[in-house]
Design a protein with these regions (language model features):
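Aromatic-lined, polymer-binding surfaces characteristic
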Residues: 27-177
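N-terminal transition regions in large eukaryotic proteins
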Residues: 1-37
Length: 177
């Protein structure tokens, strides 16, 4: 599943935030840190300002394309996490941060739109479509994201499901998502 439910909630203040982006991590840990899915484990009573500072620091460090941190799957999940946790990431933020956040989301979504055609894994394409569609729903004035995301999702469904509604692939990874 895209998001795993956890009962235990953490306060963002419990993490070592000053050194969070400077650690030399194994790829799996790096992926978990940079896709921000750990935000789903945060208590909604966590500091919004601290959460926004973590994002601001990430944007400052990764505003230019970097193959590792802009990996398609990582970027898709990061967009989903940032937008789904808007109570912590976006509410009550300063105008300067809001503008920077919006630009980063749009830049990352444009990257997904450009890269999705190069992917072969159906699961990653669907997660990418979810991120693009979520961006379109979150930024209604940018209706190109919603329209493009839905068009891509239709193409994925047409190419992976036959006329009777059965999966065309026998690949077990593509049958379970």
């Amino acid at each position: 599943s895209v998001v795993k439910y956890q009962k235990k909630k953490y306060k963002i203040e419990d993490f070592a935030l000053e050194s969070i982006w400077q650690n030399d991590l194994k790829y799996e840990e790096y992926e978990k840190l940079n896709n921000f899915f750990w935000f789903f484990s945060l208590d909604l009573k966590s500091s919004k300002r601290t959460t926004q500072t973590v994002i601001d620091n990430w944007i400052n460090k990764n505003h230019r394309y970097n193959k590792k941190s802009w990996d398609f799957d990582i970027t898709s999940k990061r967009i989903i996490s940032w937008l789904s946790n808007h109570q912590l990431t976006y509410e009550d933020c300063e105008e300067k941060f809001k503008k920077k956040f919006d630009q980063s989301i749009q830049k990352q979504t444009n990257h997904l739109l450009y890269e999705i055609k190069n992917l072969s894994e159906v699961e990653n394409k669907i997660v990418g479509c979810a991120a693009i569609i979520l961006t379109g729903l979150s930024y209604k004035e940018e209706n190109k994201y919603l329209a493009n995301g839905l068009t891509l999702l239709k193409k994925i469904i047409k190419s992976s499901i036959d006329n009777q509604g059965f999966p065309q692939s026998r690949n077990i990874k593509q049958l379970i998502f």
